[in-house]
Amino acid sequence: MLYQSIKEEQVLVHTGAEEAIFTFMNAVLESNDHIIVHFPCYQSLFEVANAIGCEVTLWETHEENGWELDLDRLRQSIKRNTKAIIINCPHNPTGYLMSKTTQQQIIEIAREHQCIVFSDEVYRGLEQNPDETLPAACDLYEHAVSLGVMSKTFGLPGLRIGWIATHNQHIYASMATFKDYLTICNSA
C-alpha cells in the first residue's frame, strides 16, 4: 500500500513527474516566495521555481558527509517568506536514504514555520531493505505533497503516469485547476 491515510479523491494524476512538479510550483508558488530545495536534485525541482521568480535556497549535501541532511542549515535557511521545503528521498542522484527520525524532524520544522513539504518520492519502494522505506510525507503532515510515478518503482516509464497525493484540499484544488490547462487526459 502506497499511502496509509490518503483517499482516492486526494490523488491527482499527471502525465509523469515533470508535469506534477510544474503544476505544483505554478499553482502554489508566487514570484515573491522563497523555497528550500534538497540539493543535488532533479533540475526541475528548483528551476521551475526560478522561472516563476521565486527565491531558491539550495540545501546542499556533500559526499564527504554521506550526503546527510544538515537540519541546522535547514533552520538557518528559513525566511519570513519561505513557502515550501522540497525534499527527495530515496535521493536521486546520490541514493541517500534519510532516517525516519530525520524525516520527522523536517516535518516538525515545516510545521513550526507553516511551510509546505513537497516530497519527491519517485524511488520510494526501491530500497534494498523494505524495512527502511520511509512513510509517505503526505501520511505524516497535512501540508505535505507526495510525488509518485509509475516509471521508477513499477518499471513502467512508457505509461507516462505520475501523481501527487495530499490531504491539503487547497493545494489539491489549485493544482487541479492549473492542470486543466495542461492536459485533459493522461495516458490510458
Give residue spans per PLM region.
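PLP-dependent aminotransferase-like
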Residues: N26-I87, K100
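Active-site pre-lysine segment of PLP-dependent enzymes
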Residues: N50, T57, E68-N81, P93-I116, ...
